[in-house]
Amino acid sequence: MAVYTDVAADELADFLKAYEIGDLLSYKGIAEGVENSNFLLHTTRGHFILTLYEKRVAADDLPYFLSLMAHLAARGVSCPQPATNRAGEVCGTLSGRPAVIINFLEGVWPRRPNLAHCAGVGEAMAKMHRAGLDYPSYRSNPLSVTGWRPLFNIAASRADEIQPGLRDFIAAELDYLEGNWPDQLPTGVIHADLFPDNVFFIGDKLSGLIDFPFSCNDILAYDVAICLNAWCFEPDLSFNVTKARALLNAYQRERALSEAEQAALPLLARGAAMRFLLTRLVDFLDVPAGALVRPKDPLEYVRKLRFQQNVAGIRDYGVEAAGAVA
């Protein structure tokens, strides 16, 4: 979450008149994250989250993930629900941006994920994948393998400002990924951004998944790969195989990975690292002046990518090919 677009109090109060969520008492911007403008609202009826969708979310895509949240919730997946205005719409316009209000989920995201957190997200992700199998809408992933080179082209001329040799490193890896990306693995609805700050816990118990704007239809195991990179590295960027084992075993208790998915997981993890390396690189080089946002370090994902390049197989993640503990 972040704030790119400021909202005046009187403008917000007028916007909220279309909703039955009470009168506005206070609001504040949420600085965490990098993608959209988010505000915590305090009204006479409680707390809500207001999101203004920015650069990477098209207005035409909003119905996909707003309906998805309702679909998942009806099948037992804990996630926020959008508020409907008096016209029966879940999406309005505020400050020239598509705007949505969702209910506030209790819990906090884990700053230092432990084994219980990793197992919790693995289990919840698998349940989400199963619950999404009958979701009728379809949205391709604009940030999958075909979307990476256009991102690289935006930042290539300045990549070496971040680290000498980074441009050639990315170019070579892109060539490899584009030439080897799998196209026969099981697909379905994925979250595509299931980082710790998008998963809430109360203690060690998972209380909900949030932030669905990148949800789409893609390779299910790619979502798992994203989580391996996001949850299983320590602050010094060493890989914690015990956390990976906890995540993968919990996932597979709900949805077993096929042999082909298991064999492809290191490649998918390389691709997942490339995706976030590139979006971070573009964002790092193009933060709007005065934006209440903390750009994330692209070099974190350079190091994660280098690690994944040396993974020989799923055993390096702490599990046997059949899914048993190594």
UniProtKB/Swiss-Prot annotation:
It comes from the Bacteria. Disulfide bonds: none annotated. One of its GO terms (molecular function) is homoserine kinase activity. Gene3D superfamilies: 3.90.1200.10, Phosphorylase Kinase, domain 1 (3.30.200.20). Keywords: Amino-acid biosynthesis, ATP-binding, Kinase, Nucleotide-binding, Threonine biosynthesis, Transferase. The keyword Kinase applies. Its EC number is 2.7.1.39. The keyword Nucleotide-binding applies. GO terms for biological process: threonine biosynthetic process. It catalyses: L-homoserine + ATP = O-phospho-L-homoserine + ADP + H(+). CDD domains: HomoserineK_II. Pathway: Amino-acid biosynthesis; L-threonine biosynthesis; L-threonine from L-aspartate: step 4/5. InterPro entries: Aminoglycoside_PTrfase (IPR002575), Homoserine_kinase_II (IPR005280), Kinase-like_dom_sf (IPR011009), Pseudomonas-type_ThrB (IPR050249). Belongs to the pseudomonas-type ThrB family. PANTHER family: AMINOGLYCOSIDE PHOSPHOTRANSFERASE DOMAIN-CONTAINING PROTEIN (PTHR21064:SF6), AMINOGLYCOSIDE PHOSPHOTRANSFERASE DOMAIN-CONTAINING PROTEIN-RELATED (PTHR21064). This is Homoserine kinase. It comes from Rhodopseudomonas palustris (strain BisB5). The lineage of its organism: Bacteria, Pseudomonadati, Pseudomonadota, Alphaproteobacteria, Hyphomicrobiales.
